[in-house]
Design a protein with these regions (language model features):
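C-terminal catalytic and target-recognition region of SAM-dependent MTase-like enzymes
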Residues: 294, 335-397
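Non-catalytic accessory regions of SAM-dependent methyltransferases
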Residues: 1-120
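Conserved SAM-binding motif I beta-strand of class I
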Residues: 248-253
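Conserved class I S-adenosyl-L-methionine
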Residues: 224-233
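Non-catalytic substrate-recognition/targeting regions of SAM-dependent transferases
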Residues: 104-111, 115-117, 133-207
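Mobile active-site "lid"/loop adjacent to the S-adenosyl-L-methionine
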Residues: 296-325
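S-adenosyl-L-methionine
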Residues: 257-299
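Conserved SAM-binding loop of SAM-dependent methyltransferases across substrates and taxa
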Residues: 234-246
Length: 397
């Protein structure tokens, strides 16, 4: 096994259990590790610090363990069992009203580079590192062992997330299928609401599970209101609003595929179609042209405006423009649920962008709640970068 020797003084982050080793911290590589190999990390004093997946790039090692010798044949089953135990402890894995959740959330479950979502018997995984991609068969086998007969399939959807320069064969496909299972989509239930999830053609793993608790919060406020759901994707917030008794819901997204799924979700929910309109248009263009006071509840949940620090300033300006448009148009006494899923945008920076937006409109705005990601998207306390989803619930006079 290859060894990574750190520069003097660069071991402190590992001693604080941060799960990344940056390339600039490395003094020497002993051996010739391939991308995705498990390597051991040592300080200048020769003491073992961690073991993890090696990769060429800014993050050179993603730590799998701070103990020596534990990455063995039982490792994957042990780690996935621990992740499942947390979902059982929080009541999510055996919920009577929800049968979809995130099983593995990367660093939050001490498995950096790996995401696994559970959709009522189907596990959809995405590898964000060469090491996790190369371990996908072992991961699938471990899922079979921990779920048993409950598991219908394991689908690998890493072609858009794994590093394409690492020489990997990035083709999506099934790693396991139970006899007789031939579906690429199915209906799942979240807090009693039905949704169609297509893991082969949908974005990410097929559904944005990280907004589950925030969708439930929208449900509390939507009764009797005219609702606008911007960047709606498959209409998660829209379905909750309809279920709450919203007077009317308009769902807006630029993706025709997404809008088709919104309509299907409205249909399987048995909602009165006259209470919902799907609009396949640019969200910001629509918001600029919409009459003032038409909506008294808005959801503003755009895709990540910044995926790296170089795009941060442009992203903050985009959040300011978007939120200024929403705050200026919402009816007096209305609510705005606004979000950022950009990891590089901090809670403080996002709040400042929204403050600037509110000041630009001149309206009186209260923050009623600060919104986050749910328990199955846990944040490793030693890896604060994992807290990527942030939101504000605004009341606008």
């Amino acid at each position: 096994m290859a060894k990574i020797i750190l520069k003097k003084g660069r071991e402190e982050s590992l001693k604080r259990f941060h799960p990344w080793v940056f390339s600039g911290a490395i003094a020497q590589i002993v051996g010739e590790p391939a991308e995705g190999d498990v390597v051991e990390v040592y300080g200048q004093d020769g003491k073992f610090l961690a073991a993890g997946h090696y990769q060429i790039g800014s993050i050179a090692v993603r730590v799998l363990s701070f103990e020596s010798g534990v990455i063995n044949d039982d490792y994957w089953k042990s780690m996935l069992s621990r992740a499942l135990a947390v979902r059982i402890a929080t009541g999510l894995a055996d919920s009577e009203t929800t049968n979809c959740y995130r099983l593995v959330h990367g660093e939050g479950d001490n498995l950096p580079g790996l995401v696994i979502d559970w959709y009522d018997g189907v596990c959809v995984m995405q590898a964000h590192s060469a090491g996790m991609f190369r371990a996908k068969k072992q991961i699938a086998q471990a899922l079979v062992e921990i779920y048993g007969d409950k598991l219908k399939a394991v689908y690998d959807k890493s072609s858009g997330t794994a590093p394409f320069k690492a020489g990997l064969d990035l083709v999506d496909g099934y790693l396991y299928k139970k006899d007789g299972f031939n579906d690429n989509e199915q209906v799942v239930v979240e807090n009693g609401h039905k949704f169609i999830v297509n893991w082969t053609e949908g974005q990410k793993t097929g559904f944005f599970l990280d907004q589950r608790e925030n969708r439930a919060l929208v449900e509390k406020y939507a009764k009797g209101r005219n609702v606008l759901n911007l960047f709606c994707y498959t209409g998660g917030f829209s379905i909750y609003a309809l279920g709450a008794g919203a007077t009317h819901v308009d769902s807006v997204d630029s993706s025709a595929k997404a809008m088709a799924l919104v309509d299907k979700n409205v249909e399987i929910g048995s909602f009165d179609k006259s209470r919902h309109t799907s609009l396949c248009v640019d969200a910001l263009d629509y918001l600029r042209d919409v009459p003032e006071d038409k909506y008294d509840l808005m959801i503003v949940d755009p895709p990540a405006f910044a995926k790296h620090r170089g795009a941060l300033n442009n992203a903050l300006r985009a959040y300011q423009r978007l939120n200024a448009a929403a705050i200026s148009k919402v009816a007096p006494g209305g609510f705005v649920f606004t979000f950022s899923c950009s990891q590089v945008v901090t809670k403080e920076a996002f709040a400042l962008a929204v403050f600037s937006a509110a000041a630009q409109t001149g309206r009186k705005v209260r923050i009623l709640d600060r919104l986050n990601q749910p328990s199955d998207h846990a944040v490793n306390i030693y890896h604060p970068e994992g807290e990527y989803l942030k939101g504000l619930l605004l009341y606008v006079e």
